[in-house]
Amino acid sequence: MIIAVDVDGGDYAPKEIIKGALKAAQEYKIGLILLGKKEVIHVHAGHYLKKYPIEIVHCPQTITFNEHAVEAIKGKPKSAIVIGTSLVKQGKADAFISAGNTGAVLAAAFFILGKIDGVERPALGAIITTRPHIPSLLIDAGANAECRPNHLDEFAHLGNIYAKQVLGLEKPRIGLLNNGEEEAKGTKLTLETHQLLKKSQLNFIGNIEGHDISLNKADVIVTDGFTGNVVLKTLEGLGDALLKLRKVGHAIDSAAHLRGRALLADVGLGSMVKGMDFEECGGACLLGVKGTVIVAHGRSHARAIKNAIGLAKRTAEKGVDKLIAEDVRLRTLTATEGEQNHVTTPV
């Protein structure tokens, strides 16, 4: 298993990215391809380069966060994002992860790897854990701001496969994020999507509301990328706030500190904080492209990168992209046969 890692991307690149990659090489026993400035990688990796199966690919160009995605990947073919994605395309890497410009990573995946045949809109699936050891998948977490009902239906099928393979769920519960549980409530988008999901073979449990996310009512939470990204960032912000609250408890006097600890134990805030910590999972997987691509958070430190590499390893080992391709093929075949069965022969 070889994972290509963009060491140029992220607020704390390259030091934290390289540090996390080295931890991953040690823990997961995998090979790495580090993509970035060769001399910089040598400075931060040092003797570890001989200790682990690590290859360096020099990338003289860097795509920054404020660059236009498509223009960047076309104008900077020697950047880590373009080269890393190309390595997956060529079969020289099993997966690629980057904490860099998300739009550029998505664009590179679309143009270089290509969409799986039959998939119209690849989507970002983000694993979230609001209850101890009970993860769920939020899809789309930010790849598609504007969607049609058939796109959300597609996201549900992508998420279903990912939840089965990576989360280990036999029959994932699919929930449609809405402003009410009632079937007749919602926007034109959610109303029409609801009807599509009802007709599907998925384990669709109906609409779920925002508060249901923290109650783990659904294993796969389906929504458009705009809403999904807002939800994801809200959970991250809540996690940060709870973490600060916890730190305040450690900073005050002993008696109050004990009361704070008791409160945390009573309501399980400690576990909740851990679950809402984006570094715990590491990144979101781009589902629907021909290969494994993990988008890590721009604020990723070493721990997040290590975990993102672990997620990439699990996703690639399960062959999620190939399973999605087969699922799309079978559903298309079934739909075609159904249409043919409804064709009447003129008398």
From Swiss-Prot:
Q: Name one Pfam family in it.
A: FA_synthesis
Q: What is its EC number?
A: 2.3.1.274
What GO CC annotations are associated with the protein?
A: cytoplasm
Q: Name one GO biological process term.
A: fatty acid biosynthetic process
Q: Which InterPro entries match?
A: FA_synthesis (IPR003664), Phospholipid_synth_PlsX-like (IPR012281)
- Give the principal location in a single coarse category: cytoplasm
Keywords of this entry: Cytoplasm, Lipid biosynthesis, Lipid metabolism, Phospholipid biosynthesis, Phospholipid metabolism, Transferase
Highest taxon of the source? Bacteria
State the SUPFAM superfamilies in the record.
Isocitrate/Isopropylmalate dehydrogenase-like (SSF53659)
Reaction(s) catalysed by this chain, per the record, are:
a fatty acyl-[ACP] + phosphate = an acyl phosphate + holo-[ACP]
What does the record give as its pathway? Lipid metabolism; phospholipid metabolism
Q: Name one GO molecular function term.
A: phosphate:acyl-[acyl carrier protein] acyltransferase activity
The record's subcellular location field reads: Cytoplasm
Q: How does it assemble?
A: Homodimer. Probably interacts with PlsY.
Free-text function comment from the UniProt entry: Catalyzes the reversible formation of acyl-phosphate (acyl-PO(4)) from acyl-[acyl-carrier-protein] (acyl-ACP). This enzyme utilizes acyl-ACP as fatty acyl donor, but not acyl-CoA.
Q: Which family does it belong to?
A: Belongs to the PlsX family.
Protein name, as recorded? Phosphate acyltransferase
**The organism's lineage?**
Bacteria, Bacillati, Chloroflexota, Dehalococcoidia, Dehalococcoidales
The UniProt gene name for this protein comes to: plsX
